[in-house]
Design a protein with these regions (language model features):
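Conserved donor-nucleotide/metal-binding helix-loop-beta segment in metal-dependent transferases, i.e.
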Residues: 95-139
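Catalytic core and acceptor-binding pocket of nucleotide-sugar-dependent glycosyltransferases
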Residues: 143-167
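N-terminal anchoring/stem segment of glycosyltransferases
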Residues: 1-86, 110, 156
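Short, surface-exposed beta-edge/turn micro-motifs
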Residues: 14-15, 113-114, 147-148
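Intrinsically disordered, low-complexity regions enriched in proline, serine, glycine
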Residues: 56, 98-99, 161-162
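Short, flexible, solvent-exposed loop/turn segments with mixed acidic/basic and small polar residues
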Residues: 6-7, 137-142
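Short acidic donor-binding/metal-coordinating loop in glycosyltransferase active sites
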Residues: 92
Length: 167
């Protein structure tokens, strides 16, 4: 894809957008509907197309495990490179932008929170945490579950959250 000259979103100056992925091909994780994005993820291409900045953190360990994200994000956030008020992390292989990033900041700020996560109906991963699943089901009346494929937060809080998750 080439940069889109007709549709370009404005990247907010106070937002860092990051994705984590493995070095090289993504073919072992691409669903058939997204074939063609094995070398450069659909998110990377989407961001280029819309003229948005994306920090791509890569790791050469295979097979890929999502737990690598914690280490990669911790290293990046501890490096001092991220100087923005807001920090957003997006999955590389199945997330695209369809609206202005400023809208996400507006939605985030409409809640009284330091981080806001996407939710899903999927219970993937909860089989490894039956106590957590029971607790979530006890407070969750809409059948929605936390999904870290898209989240935004105040950078200082996300930094602490990542460190806590690594314990």
């Amino acid at each position: 894809l080439q940069k889109n000259k007709d549709i370009r979103f404005k990247h907010p100056k106070d937002l860092t957008i990051v994705t984590c992925r493995n070095e090289g091909t993504l073919k072992d994780r691409i669903i058939p509907h997204l074939s063609g994005y094995e070398e450069s993820s659909i998110l990377e291409e989407n961001m280029k197309y819309l003229g948005l900045d994306l920090v791509v953190l890569k790791d050469n360990r295979l097979p890929w495990r999502n737990t690598f994200k914690f280490e990669m994000l911790d290293k990046y956030l501890s490096s001092g490179k991220c100087k923005t008020k807001y920090f957003m992390c997006l999955d590389a292989i199945d997330v695209i932008w369809i609206d202005e990033p400023q809208r996400v900041i507006k939605i985030f700020n409409s809640y009284d929170c330091d981080a806001l996560f996407m939710s899903t109906h999927s219970t993937d991963g909860y089989n490894c945490m039956p106590d957590v699943k029971r607790w979530v089901d006890s407070v969750n009346i809409k059948g929605r579950y936390l999904n870290s494929g898209v989240y935004i937060g105040r950078t200082h809080f996300v930094k602490k959250m990542i460190k806590e998750a690594m314990k």
